[in-house]
From Swiss-Prot:
This is UPF0339 protein YegP. The keyword Nucleotide-binding does not apply. The keyword Phosphoprotein does not apply. PANTHER family: PTHR40606, UPF0339 PROTEIN YEGP (PTHR40606:SF1). The gene is yegP. It comes from Shigella flexneri. Sequence repeats lie at residues 10-58, 61-109. Keywords: Repeat. Belongs to the UPF0339 family. Duplicated subfamily.
Amino acid sequence: MAGWFELSKSSDNQFRFVLKAGNGETILTSELYTSKASAEKGIASVRSNSPQEERYEKKTASNGKFYFNLKAANHQIIGSSQMYATAQSRETGIASVKANGTSQTVKDNT
């Protein structure tokens, strides 16, 4: 099964989206947006930037866990991954975002 985006609204009226892999696992989480339209633009940005290797910023947290940020051409963070135990599992996560990030399916939960 192909991946999809889920768009949601928080209790304080902010919006965010997550990218889900075909197995339902969240593989990318957006920043908070003040409007639904801005969150939808963020989804469009994932679609255009996720296939490009140079858009992935690989990081190590202070606790030694590995994660990545997907960035737009203007270097703004579009979304962040979960924490991974190994650098190799982070690479698998990046591959999953590349494979699922162009999905046209959006489940609107707002």
